[in-house]
Amino acid sequence: MNQQDLNQIKARGISEQQIEHQLEQIKNGFPFLKLEAAAAIGMGIMAPTDDEVKNYEQAWNEYKAEGHKIVKFVPASGAASRMFKNMFAFLSAPYDVPTTDFEKHFFENIKKFAFREALCEKCRENEGKGIKKLMGEGNYKAVVANLLEAKGLNYGQLPKGLLLFHEYSADEVRTPMEEHLVEAALYASSNGEANVHFTVSHDHLDLFKQKVAEKADFYAEKFGVKYNISFSEQKPSTDTIAANPDNTPFRNEDGSLLFRPGGHGALIQNLNEIDADVVFVKNIDNVVPDRLKADTVTYKQVIAGILVTLQKKAFEYLNLLDSGFYNHEKLEEIIRFVQRDLCCRRADIKELEDAELVIYLRKKLNRPMRVCGVVKNVGEPGGGPFLTYNNDGTVSLQILESSQIDTNNEEYMKMFTQGTHFNPVDLVCATKNYKGEPFNLPDYVDPTTGFISSKSKNGKDLKALELPGLWNGAMSDWNTVFVEVPLSTFNPVKTVNDLLRDQHQAVIGGVKHEGGWCCKH
């Protein structure tokens, strides 16, 4: 490391020791986790009955009525560029008319996209013609260029949260960011206020603030709430150093070190700064129009009701342990709660003396808690719910990505491929202890659960270090409970054509416009 390197490291708020440790991790890799089983209904996954659904909804509404602070936390830094990979490919293709199935589907259904009118305006502005005429002349690439490039809507560079997703009428077309504001009013508001926090990239912060300034009052009036909307950026101190294939630091063409964002696991630092009793976490692109929100609202309240019910019990037990007024029978009751309700087991628990048992139970009860919605596996990419062995020998529930599983272990691969459920990033978190003090969330990260990915820059291969994922290793030492939620609550948008699914059509049959489906010219 030369002086320029050290200055670069210091400017990011990273220590030299951290860099050395990161390079060591890149060199040695990370251990695979030891698995006991894939979680399933009755084995780590709750499936509430209709009566239980009502009871948990009621528990959540009672909790809200007590005036607790609730925050909806939305990771929203993702750029939309990957959504349009196929359309970028069309722009650079040697042909000019839709050829692949994806391209044909896009153009045949262009009238169904919520951004259609805005795109038509840009086409008229830049080409002197609307979408219909351009397509009629075979000028399909002009339409796509106006969608993706800076001269047009610039969707190739915008964050996903600011794209037009759902069209309700000619005057109301919503972005995912707006849909999250609506959701916050419907299940995450208390005392007439809805707190929403978006994590965004630095380049997009002003755009998000501008959209909030334009829209927040409209939704506040519509739903009768006061919005408190805040933003944060991923901290430069969570960036990780890139390495060459020989594990030496990768350097840019000017000789400087290359740092890369550490992945969504870096957001544990942002989550740690949220002052709230309960925090909902959900990805920016998993939203539906109002006509399909009922299931989402119901099951968000259910998982939140389960969280506060379990937390209340854990707090009662911690206060009891503090008081000293308990007998062995009471300790056995607490063991049952930890094992059955919190799904955390220890093989040698019967061998512990009461004094050791109290230390163990206190440690397991007094930590952050999360309840995660999981949906039936339908082949979508995503983390799976597993029972895994922890560093202290206990077995508990974790959300694992494929990179954390030893693909050479046939038994583990069978668990992964035959797992009945997966996690669509649907979490509700309790981040304060039984004394009302916030937990320091970085203390509960398992640093051995990062992973190394292969990337390239300027045609040169490099190794990138990803931090433990936010809902994976970053929450490894939390109490975790899984609850089955309907598949209807999971509607991510990974490609632009996903917006053509019925689940993303705000009005069945589409919004009729003057002059037909497309814009007027």
What is the predicted role of each segment?
Residues 133-137, 151, 155, 285-287, ...:
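Conserved catalytic alpha/beta cores of large enzymes that bind or transform nucleotide phosphates
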Residues 7-9, 13, 28-31, 35-378, ...:
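Domain-scale recognition of functional cores that engage charged ligands
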Residues 193, 368, 381, 422-424, ...:
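A general secondary-structure signal for short beta-strands and their flanking turns/coil
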Residues 181-185, 409-412, 467:
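Short amphipathic beta-strand starts and helix->beta connectors
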